[in-house]
Amino acid sequence: MSEAVPEPVRRILEEGEFCHVASLTPTGPHLTPMVFASAAGRVWVTTSRDSVKARSWRRDPRVAGLVRSARRTAAFTGTVTTYDLLDTGTWTRSLAQGPVLALAGFHFTQKNARFFAGYAVDAHHVPLAWTPPGRVFAELRLERTAILESGRVASAWGDWGDTVEGVERFRANRAGPSPLAGVPERIRDGLGRSGEGALALGTGEGPVVLPVRWAIDGGGAYAAAPSGTLALAAPSRAPNVALEVDLPSSWRARAMMGAMVRGHGQVGVVAELASGGASATRIAQLAGVEPSDAALVGIRPATVVWWRGWTSGTSRPR
């Protein structure tokens, strides 16, 4: 890594197993976990040539990510550059960046060797899009970074936000089926109704990904975090959001499962609400965040994308 990446961030990138990467689509942020590596001061990932991320990056190169280590979390924003052997438009920069790409490829293979072993075990199940001919290599250049401990901001580098403008009246959605009702039962049961997740928010500066606690309550999906953490994104009162929750596997892609709830958010600072405070307090407690310092994002789901291994689907909550 170069000196442009703070040493504490570099250590988290070396220790973390997955990077939760967000891109911006015309309908809001898209967020999924990806295996990755760090090299030459950048984060490197691969994705299918026809994936949502690859298509969105052609329109908008702004990107954000989140990496967790055992005790700390690193969040970053930046821009993406892709390298595709089948796209002649990337050949010139691929040649120019040859030594860096070779270094990145070495680190990527070394860091994720256990997943390549998993692919070998499941070789007869792996779709073409998940094999090298169907992939593009992506370079994420970090422009802003932050470290969070126990969900709270410990350090930040770059021009992050510092305020949360929440609604005055928070409305919880107690009626209707769970937003995860359309997710296959095995995945839904594995995820449960609350836990640790990642939230991508669409902002005027591009996507921002933050660590959150999440909960399902009645017909609503919610993300909760200390207000100072959400302030990094300086969100509007009603941003487009994507909440991603998953059950990772340490070596086998076929065993990974998760869901992404995409839709419109409603931001509220629990202690500042003029009405709906009791419901917001209860939901923050359900998610596992101290209400006195909690910011809550209620999500009106437009779509829920789920995956298990290489199988995925989309449901549209009522």
Region spans (language model):
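Extracellular Ig-like/FN3 beta-sandwich strand-entry sites
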Residues: A238-N240
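Charged, gly/pro-rich active-site loop segments
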Residues: M1-E3, R72-G182, S227-L230, A242-R318
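Short beta-strand segments
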Residues: G16-R49, R55, V63-S69, A74-T79, ...
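Surface-exposed connector loops and short turns at secondary-structure junctions
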Residues: A54-R58, A231-S236
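Short, basic/aromatic recognition patches
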Residues: M1-H20, V167-A198
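Generic marker of residues within folded, mature protein domains
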Residues: R11, P26, R68-A70, L128-W130, ...
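Short Gly/charged-rich anion-binding patches and loops
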Residues: P8, V52, L230
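Compositionally biased accessory segments in Actinobacterial proteins
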Residues: P177, R186-G190, L199-L201, G206, ...
